[in-house]
């Protein structure tokens, strides 16, 4: 039977995902075949596998840390909020339907047999599975039908480590409260506690650690410092923490419009790590100003976000940027927003039949019930690009518009179809390709065009590979965890040797 270790947290954003990723990296470094698993994830940032399956980004990060190709079995259930009340339910990479919280709470138990089946498949292929929970295991109003915290731990008989965030304050109360709210059989599964995001002298914590160990009878197996790491996050909390101001030490100012239903903000990580680029996220009340590049990102609800742009005043600022000659780039939902009209005849996103777009591109989009999920290779001005598509709309271009690229391969099969649009002599571009800025040479060429436009010399040898960058960050994360966790005790927990 495969060995397992489950990482749960006292709350959302306690650091479960990053701790799980770091453990995956450590086990890989130690020569073990390790794979991540999260039965149910809620996020707007998603990824398309080579087979065309949609999954959560956190498990993609963990898979990369483990040295494994992302596989939808690592995240069988993905919930993508479409409004404040509903989420799109994606199961094993494919859309089931939209459900509200009550409907999904009643339905999700039906998914357990298949969740267990794919877990067992991963177990047959690996030495260790690192399982991540969601939110808190002490949500006592939801525990009767839980499939992602203690419900999952019981399903596969996994020992649990509890992660608590000290940065927000009240860490000992959160540890004690979480454990005390559990029924006795669940408490027995908690084999260790990790205090995460600590700043200062660990010695000052010792008396509190001694007391919480006495109260809970659970050992604290590590205190992890607040580390300066740059690792993809799928949590909307991370977006709130991103910069809203231009870093004057950088040459290029790139502004990303923070849509209300913004999705896949990981598209811009490759830009954030470039030495000459400052990426800022514009929210209502912030001035867009005159950036070197304005980006409209992906959206899970383009109709709602068009209304948001109008009501917030951002629409007027975007159109002013167009008049000032600012380069504008739309990705997926952002590309749809640049068009003249978005139609929703089946009411997939709202009660409206249609809404106008920004009217910058001569395009019209019709939302459709079947989601396109593909990994693609495309040609843009003779240059090969790689990316992935996640969208439910089909966009028609006016005859005089040129496409941004030609898709040559999707999910490993040859094809030929246009993608995106280019207008205003290249000033405005739109594409359905997520991850387009991960294409290193094309991105540097694009950034150099922005540099030349403002009288700066191009950078020729400043190529920062997102893959190499990520690998360095995963190794740094593993180093931090090795220095701050009792790895001997963690291995004892995994091997059921704990005292």
UniProtKB/Swiss-Prot annotation:
Active-site residues (renumbered): 332 (nucleophile), 434
Molecular function GO terms recorded: ABC-type vitamin B12 transporter activity; catalytic activity
UniProt GO BP: cobalamin biosynthetic process
Protein name: Cobyric acid synthase
One Pfam family it belongs to: CbiA
PANTHER family assigned: COBYRIC ACID SYNTHASE, DETHIOBIOTIN SYNTHETASE
Keywords: Cobalamin biosynthesis, Glutamine amidotransferase
Organism: Streptococcus sanguinis (strain SK36)
Function: Catalyzes amidations at positions B, D, E, and G on adenosylcobyrinic A,C-diamide. NH(2) groups are provided by glutamine, and one molecule of ATP is hydrogenolyzed for each amidation.
């Amino acid at each position: 039977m495969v060995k397992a270790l489950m990482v749960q947290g006292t709350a959302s954003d306690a650091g479960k995902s990053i701790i799980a990723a770091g453990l995956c990296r450590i086990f890989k470094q130690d020569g073990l075949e390790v794979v991540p698993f999260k039965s149910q994830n809620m996020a707007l940032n998603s990824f398309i596998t080579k087979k065309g399956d949609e999954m959560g980004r956190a498990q993609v990060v963990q898979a990369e840390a483990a040295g494994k190709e992302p596989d939808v079995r690592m995240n069988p259930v993905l919930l993508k909020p479409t409004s404040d009340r509903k989420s799109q339910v994606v199961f094993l990479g494919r859309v089931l339907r939209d459900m509200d919280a009550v409907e999904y709470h009643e339905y999700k138990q039906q998914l357990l047999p298949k969740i267990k089946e794919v877990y067992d498949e991963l177990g047959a292929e690996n030495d260790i599975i690192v399982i991540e929970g969601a939110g808190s295991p002490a949500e006592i109003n939801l525990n009767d039908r839980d499939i992602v915290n203690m419900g999952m731990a019981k399903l596969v008989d996994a020992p649990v480590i509890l992660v608590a965030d000290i940065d927000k304050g009240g860490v000992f109360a959160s540890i004690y409260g979480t454990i005390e709210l559990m029924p006795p059989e669940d408490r027995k599964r908690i084999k260790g506690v990790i205090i995460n995001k600590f700043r200062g002298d660990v010695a000052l914590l010792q008396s509190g650690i001694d007391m919480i160990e006495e109260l809970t009878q659970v050992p604290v197996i590590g205190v992890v410092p607040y580390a300066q790491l740059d690792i993809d996050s799928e949590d909307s909390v991370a977006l709130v923490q991103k910069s809203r101001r231009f870093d004057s030490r950088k040459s290029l100012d790139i502004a990303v419009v923070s849509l209300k239903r913004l999705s896949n903000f990981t598209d811009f990580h490759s830009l954030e790590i470039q030495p000459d680029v400052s990426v800022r996220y514009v929210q209502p009340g912030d001035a867009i100003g005159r950036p070197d590049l304005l980006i409209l990102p992906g959206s899970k609800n383009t109709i709602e976000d068009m209304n948001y742009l109008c009501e917030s005043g951002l629409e007027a600022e975007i159109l002013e940027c167009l008049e000032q000659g600012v380069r504008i780039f739309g990705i997926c939902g952002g590309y749809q927003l640049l068009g003249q009209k978005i139609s929703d005849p089946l009411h997939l996103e709202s009660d409206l039949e249609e809404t106008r777009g920004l009217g910058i591109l001569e395009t019209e989009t019709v939302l459709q019930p079947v989601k396109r999920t593909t990994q693609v290779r495309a040609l843009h001005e003779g240059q090969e690009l790689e990316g992935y598509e996640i969208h439910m709309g089909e966009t028609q271009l006016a005859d005089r518009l040129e496409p941004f690229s030609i898709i040559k391969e999707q999910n490993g099969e040859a094809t030929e179809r246009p993608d995106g649009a280019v207008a205003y002599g290249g000033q405005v571009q739109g594409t359905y390709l997520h991850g387009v800025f991960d294409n290193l040479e094309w991105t540097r060429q694009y950034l150099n065009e922005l540099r030349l436009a403002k009288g700066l010399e191009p950078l020729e040898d400043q190529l920062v590979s997102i893959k190499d960058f990520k690998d360095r960050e995963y190794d740094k994360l593993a180093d931090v965890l090795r220095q701050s966790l009792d790895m001997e005790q963690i291995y004892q927990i995994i091997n059921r040797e704990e005292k």
